[in-house]
Amino acid sequence: MFYDFVPQSRFLLGTAGYPSPQILQQAVMASESEIITVSLRREGSQGGAFRELLTQLNKRILPNTAGCHTVKEAVTTAHMARELFNTRWIKLEVIGHADTLQPDPFALVEAARILCADGFQVFPYTTEDLILGEKLLEAGCELLMPWGAPIGSGQGLRNIEGLRSMRLWFKDIPLIIDAGIGAPSQAAQAMEMGFDGILLNTAVARAQDPLRMAQAFAAAVRAGYDAHGAGLIERRDMATASTPIFGMAQFS
């Protein structure tokens, strides 16, 4: 599924911005996530203590290159993360615009090419653009992480038709919605469309009750995944009766 790992949970959770380390721990456990993301560039002066906390959680760590704006920054950060966390995994972010936090497609593909050649297993944060997706796969990526909406915006799936096209086009490629999810209903919607996972951070970390919100997202992701697997009925323009008319009384 995700390179050499097949998770039981399709919910990936970020570890930034929680009110306290204790609440972070509680939220991660409540989420049932097996994969957690961590930003090397945003750990700050307490990085050692934070990494110890992550170790105690006993989850698979997916380091990311959040905050990187150039190929050089992203590649350097990825190599540092591999040394610190002893993992080939890297969530590759190369930001092109400080306000929208939209990926720089050209730098993203170049960084992905370099890192894949260096033996990394790259999780690229991208858009729903099909050509960009193709270029990332050609660079060596084996999965894609399209955004639902700008990072931290909570807008949900802003371009549903584009994401649906992406799911149909890359039918055999794992696709994880990354960024923009603000409510459990939005996560369920993405999973119902056939996406393979949801990665989010802000919606849980900034919730009034992060633990309860983590539980809600876990349930929503699971429900959406099960619904897609069960087979949703086709949407219709007109009503169709669900109750048969056979055996009804006849009045004269």
From Swiss-Prot:
Q: Is Transferase one of the keywords?
A: yes
Q: What EC number(s) does its UniProt record assign?
A: 2.8.1.10
A single GO cellular-component term from the record reads: cytoplasm
* Record pathway: Cofactor biosynthesis; thiamine diphosphate biosynthesis
Gene3D superfamilies recorded: Aldolase class I
Q: Can you tell which superkingdom this protein's organism belongs to?
A: Bacteria
Q: Where would you say this protein principally sits, based on its record?
A: cytoplasm
Protein's UniProt name: Thiazole synthase
